[in-house]
């Protein structure tokens, strides 16, 4: 459930409607479905089966007036009735308001020039030297230097982080005596950690034409990467942010990664907290799964920009398409392309031609199909290379070695509770590793943190390892910097965690692993979608094993996750027609 919505607000809203409007039972049920769906995630409006007569009745009852938990008894209506594409849409006020403000702010930023630079952009780009960025990346950097909004999207390995590192280096080098205040953020702790690691690594490969102090400053910026909640100062007890519309975040540049994971209300909070002249660079992959909570903001922005050439939003979005990650693993890249384009026949043919190697080696082009094994999991069904990687995690002698090994392998599944869900897979793997003959100590156990914890400064999605060191069993997490030892957290201080040999695909977003076993859901699962499979297979750096049947692949590629959102309608209303070419 989104932290921006309190479950306690649902009951008063429904009671208000019943009391004020004397709603019949069928419409009470509609409202319950709408409010529950929006609080649990998924949709930012509802396409309810409203007849013209009912639409007129709703129209007289729904008024676009603000509603908050504190004034629920005073507001005439928590709902808004909107007509779009010939269909009545019933929408909760909070999402109507959020989408309106997001559309307005995004379009204003797209049209606003960024604060002036000390040097011409051409001179800054020349500092990078030759062959540092391709044409697409150069265009993305130029856009971010010119505007207060840049939307940079692309699949894995297309150079998003490479581009960001060079953009940041140029911004720092432009004001060497007083570098800009820069914040890096991502929706989850794991995504923020990945962002930090990637930018730090990119800083080591900046061209020699840039001053050494620029590289040092960039590493300092990378080390400060945080979750969006931490950046905004979100207080879970009040549902409010320290940085907001009246108390802005002091920042010259804000870069947000993994934007597909951000829900509507968090987008609204982010935009409200920024000064008009703050450079905002939004980065993500619109083909991935949407946010767990309500909304599909990144996807809506990209689709609108793509379908409205010449508009302000079209001028500030850039897609990077030249992927390097799968150049030596073409099987993964080919499957990802087939999935994105919903080419079920091509995906099935590709998998059928990639049976798991019989010689217990990793597949040469990074892809293997394991079949579905009758829908039942057994350790023996895992490829030998995956078994060896899991054992390396379990038996690593030091926390540093265990964490390094853990980054190399993961099982990903659609469900948490299911025959092949994360909970059952974790139990089965831990049981096998514990019952091996001849082991001398309990196996190390990977864990994932389930919520932000200010006391330990562990964030939702942080991955660690529980293990014995010198007879003392504790949890260890990746260090804050590459040259520091792993962070030790006593078991008594750990927040709520779950085992992490296997993760749900949703929880894996923002992560990468050398080897990934993707366990597909049954073909009749509502989670079997194109976005789910794409997100899972693109978590792999070197090798992906697909566990599942042909029927699931075909069912998933016939289903695209569609969020009911009216953000595009709000953008349409507020966007002026593009000027004709001279």
Where are these regions (language model features)?
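Intrinsically disordered, low-complexity N-terminal extensions of AAA+/P-loop NTPases
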Residues: 1-58
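Residue-level signature of catalytic and energy-coupling elements of molecular machines
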Residues: 51, 102, 227, 257, ...
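Conserved pre-motif I regulatory segment
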Residues: 121-149
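ASCE P-loop NTPase helicase motor core
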Residues: 138-141, 145-354
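Conserved helicase motor core of P-loop NTPases
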Residues: 287-447, 451-456
């Amino acid at each position: 459930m989104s932290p921006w919505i309190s479950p306690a607000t649902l009951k008063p809203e429904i009671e208000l409607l019943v009391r004020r409007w004397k709603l019949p039972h069928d419409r009470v049920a509609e409202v319950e479905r709408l409010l529950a769906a929006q609080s649990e995630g998924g949709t930012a409006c509802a396409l309810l089966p409203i007849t013209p007569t009912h639409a007129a009745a709703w129209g007289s009852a729904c008024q676009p007036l603000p509603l908050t938990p504190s004034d629920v008894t005073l507001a005439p209506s928590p709902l808004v009735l909107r007509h779009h594409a010939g269909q009545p849409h019933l929408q909760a006020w909070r999402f109507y308001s959020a989408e309106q403000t997001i559309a307005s702010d995004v379009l204003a930023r797209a049209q606003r020039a960024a604060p002036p630079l000390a040097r011409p952009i051409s001179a800054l780009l020349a500092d990078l030297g030759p062959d540092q960025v391709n044409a697409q990346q150069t265009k993305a950097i130029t856009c971010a230097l010119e505007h207060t909004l840049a939307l940079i999207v692309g699949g894995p390995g297309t150079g998003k982080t490479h581009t960001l590192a060079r953009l940041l280096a140029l911004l720092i080098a432009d004001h060497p005596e007083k570098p800009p205040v820069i914040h890096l953020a991502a929706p989850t702790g794991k995504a923020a950690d990945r962002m930090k690691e990637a930018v730090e690594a990119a800083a080591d490969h900046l061209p020699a034409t840039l001053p050494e102090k620029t590289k040092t400053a960039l590493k300092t910026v990378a080390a400060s990467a945080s979750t969006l909640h931490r950046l905004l100062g979100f207080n879970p007890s009040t549902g409010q942010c320290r940085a907001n519309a009246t108390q802005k975040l002091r920042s010259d540049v804000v870069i947000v990664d993994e934007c597909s994971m951000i829900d509507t209300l968090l987008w609204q909070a982010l935009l409200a907290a920024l000064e008009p002249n703050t450079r905002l660079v939004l980065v993500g992959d619109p083909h991935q799964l949407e946010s767990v909570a309500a909304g599909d903001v990144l996807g809506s922005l990209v689709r609108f920009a793509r379908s409205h050439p010449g508009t302000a939003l079209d001028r500030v979005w850039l897609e990077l398409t030249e992927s390097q990650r799968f150049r030596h693993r073409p099987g993964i890249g080919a499957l990802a392309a087939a999935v994105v384009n919903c080419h079920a026949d091509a995906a099935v043919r590709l998998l059928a031609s990639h049976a798991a190697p019989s010689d217990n080696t990793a597949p040469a082009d990074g892809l293997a199909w394991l079949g579905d094994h009758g829908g039942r999991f057994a350790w023996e069904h895992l490829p030998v290379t995956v078994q060896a990687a899991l054992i390396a995690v379990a038996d690593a002698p030091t926390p540093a070695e265990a964490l390094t090994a853990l980054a190399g392998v993961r099982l990903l599944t659609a469900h948490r509770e299911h025959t092949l869900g994360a909970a059952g897979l974790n139990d089965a793997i831990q049981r096998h590793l514990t019952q091996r003959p001849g082991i001398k100590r309990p196996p190390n156990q990977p864990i994932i943190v389930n919520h932000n914890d200010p006391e330990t400064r562990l964030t939702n999605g942080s991955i660690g390892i529980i293990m014995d060191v010198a007879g003392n069993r504790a949890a260890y997490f990746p260090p804050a910097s590459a040259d520091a030892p792993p962070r030790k957290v006593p078991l008594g201080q750990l927040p709520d965690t779950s085992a992490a040999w296997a993760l749900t695909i949703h929880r894996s977003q923002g992560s990468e692993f050398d080897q990934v076993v993707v366990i597909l859901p049954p073909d009749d699962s509502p989670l079997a979608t194109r976005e789910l499979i794409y997100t899972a297979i693109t978590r792999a750096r070197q090798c992906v094993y697909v566990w599942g049947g042909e029927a699931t692949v075909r069912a998933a590629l016939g289903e695209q996750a569609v969020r009911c959102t009216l953000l595009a309608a709000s953008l349409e209303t507020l966007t002026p027609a593009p000027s004709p070419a001279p």
